[in-house]
Amino acid sequence: MKYNSGRLLFAVDLAGTLLFGIEGATAAIAGHLDLLGLMVLAFSTALAGGIFRDLLIGDVPPSALRDWRYSAIAFTGGAIVFFLHRFVQGIPNSVIVVLDAAGLALFAVAGTEKALLYKMHPFVAILLGTITGVGGGTVRDILLAQVPVVLRADVYATAAMAGAAAMILGRRLGLSSTLAAVVGGMLCFGLRLVSVWQHWNLPTVSG
């Protein structure tokens, strides 16, 4: 995946891939999956969102399948968790939440940037940035037979959407693409963390 903004956003995409690979593998450990299951979750959590985005914008085969570095980094995240599983199991849940929020922010920004690169309407770019951020976690939860976090009363997709929107707004206000991406990513990251720590939830229907 190549960006007009240069190597920085490419590095952001790879960083998100590593973080979500680690997060997916950690979920596999918690779900008592074997090595194959761990690697499948690392791969799907890290790359599914980007694959969905690329299919929707017509970038086929998806970047994650064209460029070996994506798969390599996703599997590296899985390997880190596998070989350091005793250490990983001792990591507080708060650290996992921070890593997940960081991965969400990185992917929301990278997904929005690629959508803009493909001349998508800003509203569509926001949706594609959100899909990039939440797609992997959705597949992870489905594979673990759980209700996807994006469908729960939780500020998750909302945080990704807010970050993507802030990124586009920043560019409209004259910020450089890099600075706008930083602003959007920080908003997504901060909103996700605050929502978890303050127990913010979206409204639900009770009956």
Regions found by a protein language model. Give the residues of each.
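Membrane-embedded alpha-helical hairpins and interfacial helices in multi-pass inner-membrane proteins
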Residues: 122-125, 138
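Membrane-helix boundary/interface segments in integral membrane proteins
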Residues: 136-146
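Alpha-helical transmembrane segments and their membrane-interface boundaries
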Residues: 1-122, 145-207
